[in-house]
């Protein structure tokens, strides 16, 4: 039987009909990769380099810079940001959401609070480009807090834990990812040598083995004002690391990138300049040259197929573009979809014990976390012009004085930190028009307010690390199903007291920067006591947890190499592995962890298939 040839076999499990369905079984491959975003593309490249035959299954359509990023259609705000062209189709599958276990969850039917991607490149095609590493403290968060503040400092019901891997172990993979992405930035120290003082480096950054591939992007006027104000109140501003190129670049795989022109259309759009790193631009061109690699679009994976004892995966079952069930046998299964899709597939497939919040037992679905973000906007008079239509998704200036544990949390009684930044990514004419509080939503007064504020404002964020709690988790919904007849994933989530107290503290500190700019008005603020998670307002798409990594199979779904404790030929890279949220954006950490996992597969697992860590 040749590659791609089909035979009909009976397959049990969820289906669109009742009972047993008939599926087409393809020839076995060495590895099947589920989801082709950053994690999937990295894994596919690494495993293909190792000599494996790799098939990547992407549920969405084929996407690329052309035609999806072709100018001028690619800067159509109505199509992309308002009508959400590149995002997940919620009419086929979504999640249900409730604030606590006493409520009945209802489906998330309109894209708003978070925006999962679909299609080639996943969210990596239309992300902003903010490309951080991680603060080392956040990798051993529980043990660090217990050592510095005592075990009783961590609130009851907070389930934070250590990642099980250190910054020094991951540093080569952060470096590798930056060279693939073409990241622009300013280093602080390289191999212990100071190079970034008064040159845009981050005073709080951990040591690096080499410099950024490209210098930091130029600072917008907003970023300059923020940096001056931050310095004036004693903080340490630095250039944000950006996967938007500051100059021409050829990456590790031979992919060529052009310099960013600050067009302001990054988040929600495909970059027409080949300036923003994406799986489509930075990895796929090299994979296309590999005869051992195949990407199949419109391939919706229904489940991972397991042996009768559920100790080994035999491949996956998916629906192709014609709606036919297809079985793709494989020796190795990589779940590299979006965070909650990884968790959903594990629950549907019976990989790992589902989390039970009542007993606090089980692992799949536990420690779901988000991003605790707060925003302030400074409005100036007409003598200060900020040109907010200019922008690059990852460019900006940040301060880390209150990130991670860079300050003494003891007097304040909350866990977690937050960077502050001005990240001018391009304020759009439909969705990005700030007006003072009390302005009507339409009419002559609204028009006058827009004219008065649009070109004279700055927006800044406190990008708070969100902690994990026993009360916030993922499981299968008992009431709602997707179009394929499978239970939807249920998200039980709400802000906790720690989140609100942290947000209020951070906004107070960030407000000092804002006031130092001498604006005529400041709008925005922190969550107040009793604030509930609002699904109707965009916050971030930085979801994490649910299939977390760790050193104990009783409290983690995957080991330190992202290998399933229960099914050792299944690996699950992605933000689903984070035991709690980070202060920084997750993409850099996802990329480094995926390279780390891929190396373990190549150098250890393929030589001796089986558990890489003994339970």
UniProtKB/Swiss-Prot annotation:
InterPro entries the UniProt entry points to: FAD/NAD-bd_sf, GMC_OxRdtase_N, GMC_OxRtase_C
Recorded catalytic activity of this chain's protein: D-gluconate + A = 2-dehydro-D-gluconate + AH2
Name recorded for this polypeptide: Gluconate 2-dehydrogenase flavoprotein
Disulphide bridges, residue numbers: none
Thermal properties: Optimum temperature is 30 degrees Celsius.
Active site per database record: 542
Location(s) in or outside the cell: Cell membrane
Assembly with partners or alone: Heterotrimer.
UniProt function note: Part of the heterotrimer that catalyzes the conversion of D-gluconate to 2-dehydro-D-gluconate. This subunit functions as the dehydrogenase.
Enzyme class of the recorded protein, top EC level: oxidoreductase
Predominant location: membrane
Matches recorded under PANTHER family: LONG-CHAIN-ALCOHOL OXIDASE
């Amino acid at each position: 039987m040749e590659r791609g040839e089909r035979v009909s076999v009976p397959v049990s499990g969820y289906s669109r009909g009742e009972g047993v369905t008939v599926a087409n079984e393809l020839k076995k491959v060495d590895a099947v990769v589920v989801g082709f975003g950053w994690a999937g593309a990295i894994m596919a490249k690494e495993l293909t380099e190792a000599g494996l035959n790799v098939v990547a299954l992407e549920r969405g359509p084929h996407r690329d810079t052309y035609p999806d990023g072709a100018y001028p259609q690619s800067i159509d705000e109505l199509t992309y940001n308002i009508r959400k062209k590149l995002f997940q189709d919620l009419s086929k599958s979504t999640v249900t959401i409730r604030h606590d276990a006493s409520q009945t969850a209802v489906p998330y039917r309109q894209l708003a609070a978070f925006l999962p991607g679909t299609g080639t490149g996943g969210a990596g095609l239309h992300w902003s480009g903010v490309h951080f590493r991680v603060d080392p403290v956040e990798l051993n968060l529980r043990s660090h807090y217990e050592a510095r503040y005592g075990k009783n400092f961590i609130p009851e019901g907070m389930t934070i834990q250590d990642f099980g891997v250190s910054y020094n172990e991951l540093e080569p993979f952060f470096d590798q990812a930056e060279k693939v992405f073409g990241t622009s930035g300013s280093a602080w120290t390289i191999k212990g040598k100071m190079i970034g003082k008064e040159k845009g480096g981050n005073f709080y950054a951990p040591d690096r083995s080499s410099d950024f591939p490209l210098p930091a992007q130029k600072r917008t006027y907003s970023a300059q004002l923020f940096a001056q104000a931050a310095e004036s109140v004693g903080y340490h501003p630095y250039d944000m690391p950006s996967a938007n190129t500051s100059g021409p670049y050829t990456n590790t795989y031979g992919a060529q990138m052009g310099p960013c022109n600050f067009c302001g259309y990054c988040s929600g759009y495909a970059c027409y300049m080949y300036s923003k790193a994406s799986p489509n631009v930075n990895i796929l061109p090299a994979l296309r040259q590999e005869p051992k690699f195949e990407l199949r679009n419109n391939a919706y994976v229904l489940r991972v197929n397991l042996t009768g004892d559920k100790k080994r995966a035999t491949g996956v079952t998916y629906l192709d573009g014609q709606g036919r069930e297809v079985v793709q046998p494989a020796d190795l299964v990589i779940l590299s979809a979006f965070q909650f899709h990884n968790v959903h597939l594990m629950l549907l497939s019976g990989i790992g014990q589902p989390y039970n919040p009542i007993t606090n037992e089980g692992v799949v679905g536990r420690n779901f976390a988000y991003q605790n973000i707060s925003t302030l906007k400074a409005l100036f008079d007409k003598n200060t012009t900020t040109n907010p239509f200019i922008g690059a998704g990852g460019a900006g200036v940040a301060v880390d004085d209150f990130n991670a544990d860079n300050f003494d949390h003891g007097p304040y009684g909350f866990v977690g930190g937050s960077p502050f930044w001005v990240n001018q990514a391009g304020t759009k004419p439909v969705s990005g028009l700030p007006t003072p509080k009390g302005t009507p939503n339409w009419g002559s007064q609204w028009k006058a307010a827009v004219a008065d504020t649009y070109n004279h404002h700055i927006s800044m964020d406190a990008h708070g690390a969100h902690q994990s709690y026993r009360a916030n988790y993922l499981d299968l919904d008992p009431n709602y199903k997707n179009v394929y007849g499978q239970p939807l994933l249920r998200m039980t989530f709400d802000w906790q007291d720690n989140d609100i107290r942290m947000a209020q503290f951070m906004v107070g500190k960030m407000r000092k920067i804002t006031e130092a700019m001498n604006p005529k008005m400041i709008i925005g603020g922190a969550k107040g006591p009793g604030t509930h998670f609002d699904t109707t307002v965009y916050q971030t798409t930085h979801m994490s947890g649910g299939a977390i990594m760790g050193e104990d199979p009783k409290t983690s779904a995957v080991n330190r190499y992202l290998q399933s404790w229960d099914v050792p030929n299944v690996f699950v890279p992605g933000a689903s592995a984070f035991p709690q949220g980070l202060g920084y954006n997750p993409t850099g950490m996802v990329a480094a962890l995926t390279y780390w996992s891929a190396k373990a597969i190549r150098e250890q697992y393929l030589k001796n298939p089986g558990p890489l860590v003994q339970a």
